[in-house]
Amino acid sequence: MSEELGKISKPQAENVQLKKKLYLVQNIQNYFPGNKDFESLLKEYWDSISDQLDNLEKTAGNINFIYIEGMYQEYDVASKLLNDNNKWCLSTIESRVKSGSNYKKIENENNYKQLIDWTRIAQLGFVSENAKEVTEENYKKIITERSTIIHDELNRIKEGEAALFIISSGSHKFPEDMEIFNVIPPSLDKMNRWITENQNSLQDSNQEKEVQDEGEQDKQSGLWTP
C-alpha cells in the first residue's frame, strides 16, 4: 500500500507506526557537472527530501535502516563514493546515520558486478543469435537473483521499523506486508522541466566542446586532418 505524504490522520499514523515501512526516494544525481543552475536545483531537491523525511519520521516512524540501490560497499567506502559523485545525497543520509540510522548495503557485490557486465555486453548488439540468447538468458538470471536479494533484505525489516530506500529504478517488488511511502517533493518537477528545457542546448554545448578538444589534439599531434 502506498501512502500520500502529509495526509495521514492521527489514528492512521498510530496504525502505520506499528507496521513495516519503506520510504522511497528517487536518486537524482549530478547529470551536468559544473552547471551551477542544475547544481542549485539538485541542492534544492535533496534539501526538500530531507525536510519531507523529517516530517515523515514524526508521523510514521523513525528511519532504522538506509539502503541505496547500486551500492554494495560498506558505509565507510560508500560515503566516500557519494561524496565524490553525489554530495547532496550524502548530506541527506549522513545526518541520519549520525542520529542512529543503520546504513546497510542492499546489493550483493558479485551479483551486481555481473549485472553491469551483462548489461554492457547486451548494449553492444549481436551478429550471432546464439550469443544473443546466451546473453539474454544470463541477464534474466542475474536480474531474478538480484530481485530476490533485495526482496529478502527488505523482508528482514520488522514490524514497527522503517527503512529509507534511495532508488534508481522503478522495477522493484516489495514485500506485501510493507507500507510504502513515495517521497516526491515539488522540486522534482522543477528539475525535470529544467532538464527538458536545457537538454538540447547542453548537448550542443558538449558536442561543440568535443569538436574543440579534437581540434586541439590534432594541432598537438601535428597531423593534417581534412
Predicted regions and their residues:
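Compositional signal for N-terminal targeting/processing segments
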Residues: 1-226
